[in-house]
Design a protein with these regions (language model features):
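Internal, Lys/Arg-enriched amphipathic helical interaction segments that engage polyanionic partners
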Residues: 1-32
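Domain-level recognition of nuclease-like catalytic cores that cleave nucleotide substrates
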Residues: 2-8, 152-187
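Nuclease catalytic cores
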Residues: 29-34, 38, 67-71, 75
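Acidic-basic catalytic patches of nuclease active cores, encompassing PD-(D/E)XK
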Residues: 43-91
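Long, charged, glycine-rich C-terminal linkers/tails
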Residues: 58-61, 67, 89-109, 180-184
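Conserved catalytic cores of phosphodiester-cleaving nucleases, focusing on short active-site segments
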Residues: 106-108, 112-122
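Hydrophobic beta-strand segments of well-ordered beta-sheets in folded domains
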Residues: 111-113, 143-150, 177-179
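Catalytic cores of nucleic-acid endonucleases
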Residues: 119-169
Length: 187
C-alpha cells in the first residue's frame, strides 16, 4: 500500500540521516587508521601492481610510473586513502613545541593524532632513522603519534625490535606512539 511505502521511506530516510550524522569514536578512528597503515601494502599492490582488467583504460606502463620516491609521495598516498573516511585530516600542519616549530605530515585534530611518514633512502642509516623518529616522538605534543616508515631501502635490520623500541602508551608515557614499518619484498 501507499501508506506502508511512505512509512518505509520515512524510516529509511531517518536511517540515512542517522548514519550521516554518525561520528567515529576516537578508539574506532584510531583503530581504523592503524588498520589502514598496517595494510597499506595491500592498497599499493592492488592499485599499482595487480593485473588490470582487459577493458580498463589505464595501462600497467602508466601505473608503473607512479612510485613512492620519497616521504612526500608516501604522505600524498596516505592522505588520499584517509581523507574520504576522515575529511578533517590535514597535511603539513605547523605547531609550536615551546622552543621551535614542528610540522606534522598528517594531523587529525578530532583525535589529536599525528601521522609522521618516513621513507628510507640510500644515504640514510638505521641509526639516522632512529634519531629522527626519537626526536619527533619527543617533540610532538599530540596524544597519538603514528610513525609510518616505508623502508624501501631495507635499512631496518629487525623491524619487530625497531617498532618495539618506540611503542609508548598513554597511561605510562602521556602519549600513544606506534610504529608501522613496511619493507617491500620482490621475489
Amino acid at each position: 500500500s501507499i501508506i506502508k511505502a511512505i512509512k518505509d521511506t520515512v524510516v529509511y530516510l531517518d536511517e540515512i540521516n542517522t548514519i550521516s550524522e554518525a561520528v567515529i569514536s576516537e578508539a574506532v578512528g584510531i583503530r581504523l587508521i592503524e588498520q589502514i597503515l598496517n595494510n597499506f601494502y595491500l592498497y599499493y599492490r592492488s592499485m599499482f601492481q595487480n593485473p588490470l582488467h582487459k577493458k580498463a583504460t589505464m595501462s600497467m606502463d602508466e601505473l608503473k610510473k607512479i612510485q613512492i620516491g620519497n616521504e612526500y609521495d608516501l604522505q600524498r598516498m596516505l592522505y588520499a586513502l584517509l581523507v574520504p573516511i576522515f575529511p578533517l585530516i590535514r597535511q603539513e600542519v605547523e605547531s609550536d613545541n615551546g622552543y621551535g616549530g614542528m610540522r606534522a605530515d598528517l594531523y587529525l585534530e578530532e583525535y589529536d593524532l599525528i601521522i609522521e611518514t618516513k621513507c628510507t633512502r640510500a644515504s640514510m642509516t638505521e641509526k639516522k632513522l632512529l634519531e629522527e623518529l626519537g626526536a619527533d616522538g619527543f617533540y610532538y605534543k599530540a596524544k597519538t603519534v603514528f610513525f609510518f616508515v616505508y623502508d624501501k631501502k631495507s635499512i631496518i635490520k629487525n623491524p619487530d625490535v625497531f617498532k618495539a623500541a618506540f611503542v609508548r602508551e598513554q597511561e605510562k608515557n602521556g602519549k600513544n606512539i606506534k610504529v608501522i614499518v613496511l619493507q617491500p619484498v620482490e621475489l
